[in-house]
Amino acid sequence: QFQITSNVLSGLTHIDAELVARGDLAESWEVTDDGKEYTFKLREGVTFHDGADFTAEDVVFSFERAKSETSAMKELLTSIVEIRAVDDHTVEFVTDGPNPILPNNFTNLFIMDKGWTEANNTVNVQDFEGGEITYATTNANGTGPYVLQSRAPDVKTVMVKNDNYWGIDQFPMDVTEIVY
């Protein structure tokens, strides 16, 4: 599942070959001296696969969704007490205390298009353990290097190269199709 998700959706950060958190959808971030506030500057000009602009509102929405009671990712975010969009390309996270691994935790949290998610009735996190299938189980609208072309869970997944990927110059992509 992670291999599929991480090729279609992107997070604020990723772990590089030296196991250091680096910016993905975030260009940079700063932490206050007391370690309680993180300010992330987002990449400008990034679009979702359907052409919608990626903004700070998508980040706030995705993290609030990930903090929800039914989310399997909520434990990674327990120290966050507030998330706010400062402007279209800046997000602030306020924590209950210093959390030096927070940028590392963000590598496991993928940003969803708020508008797409609302339009497709997938705002609530699906019940994986209960076997729930939602529109987001078989469809996606991400910012990642590959576009989900088709998905039949536990049968076959096809992804094709995203020619509009923001990082295409930094990460040459020779593979045009991935089939699981």
Predicted regions and their residues:
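N-terminal lobe/hinge region of extracytoplasmic solute-binding protein
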Residues: 1-33, 64, 141
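A structural "hinge/loop" feature
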Residues: 1-3, 25-27, 52, 102-114, ...
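Sec-exported extracytoplasmic/periplasmic mature domains
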Residues: 13-17, 34, 47, 59, ...
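Gly/Pro-rich hinge or "lid" segments in bacterial periplasmic/extracellular proteins
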Residues: 16-20, 109-170
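Aromatic- and charge-enriched surface segment that lines or borders ligand/interaction sites
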Residues: 27-72, 86, 92, 178
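Short helix-initiation/N-cap motifs at beta->coil->alpha
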Residues: 35, 78, 141, 177-180
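Surface-exposed binding/hinge segments that line
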Residues: 41, 75-125, 150-152
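Ligand-site clamp/hinge motif
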Residues: 43, 65, 162-180
